[in-house]
């Protein structure tokens, strides 16, 4: 069934198979690429890299990302033309971009941007791919800065890249559309601009309509989740309960597109995109288990959300003992002597703050060092390029005099 698709540059067909099968495809392609009898080693190594990269995107596994990097390096060794050299460099840049998306680390982004700016390509499709990579990297940097002007400049680059994306595989063009909509959404929220939010909504509706649930379930789910976030932002600006309800319906529709094992990280992202308090504790615990790779941004966010929900539940039932027990679990984890990834540490600090404040309200005592915990979590999340985790710490910070 997939024989023809396997030879295509468009990896959109992978959306139809689960993460385990993607891993099997990546292993098969890497083995074939390494055979002496392989007639097109460059193409095979590049395809193997793309497959491992897709597996990493679905599961958050560092090992898969490292395998993708090794395959891209092998592809570089087998280049025979300047255009192939550029294509291998673009694949390496895509791996750097995904590593940043999964684990943070702005230094990775800076290095990838420097490489992308120096690319020279001959074929129109390679030039378009280079422009798309550069635009997407700039979009990540703009989102880190949070400055409206930077967001709008990055949006212009994405527009230009999309204009030249007609020669790219559909999945690459869809990535650009999702990034442009996400950027418009973020700029709209930052500027409290309903026009930008509406623009993002139109782009996402078009993407949802073109992404069939029978062929592109993951792209459809990503667009639905972003559209839900946009409606929630509009609801907050306009005070509209109807828009808020529509946003919740879109989140549920996104979650219904696939099962958690099909794409664990997409499932986590959809669940965490829902407004705080709407996601049941059981689902948050499942999200945390699926995102257990050390240092994974989504895993850290899931852990913090689960701890926040545990604190709310224990406080609502007046269970001081449960709060104390949860704090003890975190302390044991932090003092175990094993290396803790910075973002996991930050999530635990925010969780400890939630628990300490809940216990303080129940016992009438002043929680100690909460401000310091949250300040250090904010700084760590900022340094590692995880603005979503930083926002969670800011939201948890008690108002002075409250």
Question: What do the PLM-derived regions correspond to, one by one?
Answer:
Residues 1-24, 345-402:
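C-terminal non-catalytic interaction modules
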Residues 250-360, 373:
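Eukaryotic tandem repeat interaction scaffolds
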Residues 1-198, 211-218, 396-402:
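Flexible inter-repeat linkers and adjacent short helices
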Residues 66, 103, 110, 152, ...:
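Residue register within tetratricopeptide repeats
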Residues 49, 56-59, 93, 98-103, ...:
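Short coil/turn linking the two alpha-helices of tandem helical-hairpin repeats
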Residues 104, 125-126, 166-174, 192, ...:
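Acidic, Ser/Thr-rich low-complexity linear motifs
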Residues 40, 44-47, 84, 91, ...:
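Structural signature of alpha-solenoid helical repeat junctions
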Residues 69-77, 113-121, 155-166, 201-213, ...:
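Amphipathic alpha-helical segments of tetratricopeptide repeats
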């Amino acid at each position: 069934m997939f024989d023809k698709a396997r030879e295509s540059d468009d990896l959109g067909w992978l959306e139809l198979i689960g993460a385990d099968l993607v891993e099997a495809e990546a292993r098969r392609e890497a083995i074939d690429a390494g055979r002496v009898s392989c007639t097109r080693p460059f193409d095979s190594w590049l395809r193997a890299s793309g497959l491992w990269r897709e597996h990493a995107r679905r599961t958050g596994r560092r090992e898969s990302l490292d395998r993708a990097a090794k395959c891209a390096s092998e592809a570089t060794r087998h280049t025979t033309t300047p255009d192939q050299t550029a294509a291998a460099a673009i694949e390496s840049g895509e791996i750097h971009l995904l590593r940043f998306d999964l684990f943070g680390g702005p230094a990775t982004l800076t290095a990838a941007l420097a490489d992308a700016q120096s690319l020279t390509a001959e074929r129109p499709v390679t030039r378009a791919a280079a422009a798309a990579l550069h635009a997407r990297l700039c979009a990540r940097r703009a989102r880190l800065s949070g400055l409206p002007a930077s967001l709008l400049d990055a949006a212009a680059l994405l527009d230009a890249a999309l204009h030249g994306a007609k020669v790219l595989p559909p999945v690459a063009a869809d990535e650009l559309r999702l990034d442009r909509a996400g950027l418009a959404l973020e700029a709209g929220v930052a500027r409290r601009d309903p026009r930008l939010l509406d623009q993002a909504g139109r782009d996402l509706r078009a993407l949802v309509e073109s992404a069939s649930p029978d062929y592109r379930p993951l792209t459809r789910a990503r667009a639905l989740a972003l559209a839900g976030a946009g409606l929630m932002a509009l609801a907050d600006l306009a005070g509209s309960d109807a828009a808020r309800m529509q946003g919740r319906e879109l989140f549920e529709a996104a979650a219904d597109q696939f099962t958690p094992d099909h794409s664990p990280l997409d499932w986590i992202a959809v669940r965490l995109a829902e407004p705080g308090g709407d996601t049941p504790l059981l689902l948050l615990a499942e999200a945390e288990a699926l995102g257990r790779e050390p240092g994974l941004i989504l895993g850290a966010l899931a852990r913090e959300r689960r701890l926040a929900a545990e604190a709310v539940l224990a406080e609502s039932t007046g269970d001081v003992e449960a709060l104390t027990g949860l704090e003890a679990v975190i302390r044991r984890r932090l003092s175990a002597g094993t290396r803790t990834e910075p973002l996991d540490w930050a999530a635990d600090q925010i969780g400890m703050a939630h628990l300490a404040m809940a216990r303080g309200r129940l016992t009438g005592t002043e929680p100690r060092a909460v401000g310091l915990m949250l300040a250090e979590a904010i700084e760590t999340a900022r340094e590692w390029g995880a603005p979503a985790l930083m926002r969670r710490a800011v939201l948890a910070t008690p108002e002075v005099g409250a």
